[in-house]
Structure formats: structure tokens, C-alpha cells
A protein has these predicted regions:
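Active-site environment of non-heme Fe oxygenases that use a 2-His-1-carboxylate facial triad
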Residues: 16-22, 31-191
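A gly/proline- and charged-residue-enriched helix-loop-helix capping module
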Residues: 2-24
């Protein structure tokens, strides 16, 4: 993303042929927007739709046992920033200052480890569900299905796992207690 004005960012930069599954804007963050706005300056030649979903219906479709486990534990997001894979830490944190990255991590409860001068591992446990500020309903609100390795095309996931192992993946998600999220749970969430 690029910042085009103070707190105004472009959408995720992604291939025009690609598909980004439905998700909650910045739910992996400690501070997410109350509102999002959409604008298209240059429409794509084909497709280009932005689907929206009623989160009450989405939450209701997820079985109670799954909701309760995520509600109890939250989601642990693991990111590995580096020049050879995904984003660099400078791109991800939009700064060249390691001190600023560390201050941000301390402020947001994110654990971090500098693996070397160019690579950073960050782990954060966040909520899996939130209480809606107006209705009071507890709703599904996370990126577990997006960050998890199973969201990658299978051939890419296998290649990355062979190359860097599970702990070196650019991103992955676990239950907040660090245990793996089962494939069938993710299949249910994505259904």
C-alpha cells in the first residue's frame, strides 16, 4: 500500500487477475478503521468487483465450537519480513528506523526478533471476535484464513515450506495459544 494523504492509503497492490478473499480490514492490527471508503481511479478491463458481506450472517455460519475456541484464544499472526520473500520490514512498517519498529512493537504488544540486518520476525496475538460498538453483537473479526499458509496456492506453499520451513514463511496464523489451526476449521471458515 502507498500512503496518498495522511491516513489515506491505496488498496493492497495485487495482480489484476488475482482474487483477494473476503476479509476484515486490518483486523490483525491493534487499531483498525471504523470506516473504509472505496474509490477507483482507473477501472480494470475485466472484473474489478469489491464484494461486501454482512458480518452478522458470516458469524452465524461459523459453528459455535469454532467461534468459542477462537474467542477463548484469539489468533496469533506471525510475519517474517525480508528482501527475498514478501515485504521488507521497511515496507511493512513504512520506516527505515529499527528503533521506530521496536517502539511500534512495544506499543502494540507485538513480539519481535531481528534475525539479521534485513530480516525481522514479528508475532502478535489479537482478538478473533469483537463486540460491535452499536449493536453489542459479538462478531467474527480476524485474518486467520488469510494469513494461514493454506491460503497460498498449494504449489507455492509446498515450495516455501521446502525452502524456509514453517517458521520462515512470510506469514502464518495459529490459535492465540500457539497451537496449529486445523485444516478443516479453515475450510469451514472459508465456506
Amino acid at each position: 500500500r502507498q500512503e496518498v494523504a495522511h491516513r489515506v492509503f491505496t488498496s493492497t497492490e495485487f495482480s489484476p487477475d488475482g482474487w483477494i478473499p473476503p476479509h476484515h480490514e486490518m483486523s490483525y492490527s491493534h487499531n483498525w478503521p471504523s470506516y473504509i471508503h472505496f474509490y477507483c481511479q482507473t477501472p480494470p478491463a475485466t472484473q474489478g468487483r469489491t464484494p461486501l458481506a454482512d458480518e452478522r450472517r458470516v458469524s452465524a455460519r461459523i459453528p459455535e465450537a469454532i467461534r468459542q475456541r477462537f474467542l477463548r484464544h484469539g489468533v496469533c499472526y506471525v510475519r517474517n519480513y525480508g528482501p527475498e520473500i514478501d515485504l521488507t520490514w521497511q515496507e511493512g512498517f513504512q520506516t527505515d528506523s529499527r528503533a521506530e519498529v521496536e517502539a511500534y512493537c512495544r506499543q502494540t504488544g507485538t513480539q519481535w526478533t531481528w534475525l539479521d540486518d534485513q530480516r525481522l520476525n514479528a508475532r502478535q496475538v489479537r482478538q478473533a471476535m469483537v463486540r460491535h460498538p452499536l449493536s453489542g453483537e459479538t462478531l467474527w473479526f480476524n485474518h486467520a484464513h488469510m494469513f494461514h499458509v493454506s491460503n497460498m496456492p498449494p504449489a507455492l506453499a509446498r515450495a516455501l515450506l521446502d525452502e524456509v520451513g514453517e517458521q520462515g514463511l512470510p506469514r502464518n496464523a495459529y490459535y492465540g495459544d500457539g497451537s496449529p489451526i486445523e485444516a478443516e476449521v479453515l475450510d469451514t471458515i472459508r465456506a
